[in-house]
Amino acid sequence: SEEERTAYADYSRQMKKCLMKGKNGKFKLSEKGKKIALKRARLVAGAINKIEMLEKEIMPYKDDRHLLVYCGATKVLDPDKELTDIDDDDLRQIDIVTDLLGNKLKMKVSQFTSNESVEERAVLKREFAKGDTLQALIAIKCLDEGVNIPSIKTAFILASTTNPKEYIQRRGRVLRLSEGKEYAEIYDF
């Protein structure tokens, strides 16, 4: 949104003021600058337009199986609120995506997060692999490491990362070989 673009530019200007030259001659952010950078990253992760774009891009897959949606561990700003008015009542991105896919698009979806027990996640993985009762998993960071679900064919990544390990892990979830899977698709927002 325009408000998000303005806030992004403002955070960027503030970060520029927080650059300092290190002993090695390279520039780095001060602690204050790092906090501003985190705010800017959260703003990008929770951008409202990502939800609109997801709805548009996922429509051709509405009846498919083995879909994965990675969400940011962030809240999405209500377009009618000011950026300074964010509070605990704002919805988490994962909840908005779950509502969009499950209620609006009538898809069979489930969240796959640290809130689900180990046993619940095992059941979700089995159901997802079968594809009969579960079309899509909606996750935050729970699938970053140590989870093997090779049947994932299509991923929608709303939470990109600059961490190389996380970047590779998230794509690796989709790019694994699986019986009957000839290719994989990744949409990175």
Set out the residue ranges of the language-model regions.
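Interdomain helical connector at the RecA1-RecA2 junction of SF1/SF2 helicase-like NTPases
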Residues: 1-65, 74-92, 98-99
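Conserved nucleotide-binding/hydrolysis micro-motifs of P-loop NTPases
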Residues: 4, 74-76, 117, 143-144, ...
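Alpha-helical scaffold elements adjacent to nucleotide-binding pockets in ATP/GTP-utilizing enzyme cores
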Residues: 7, 151, 166-170
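Conserved helicase ATPase core of P-loop NTP-dependent helicases/translocases
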Residues: 68, 90-144
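Short beta-strand/turn micro-motifs composed of small residues
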Residues: 71, 113, 188
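Conserved segment of the helicase C-terminal RecA-like domain
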Residues: 173-189
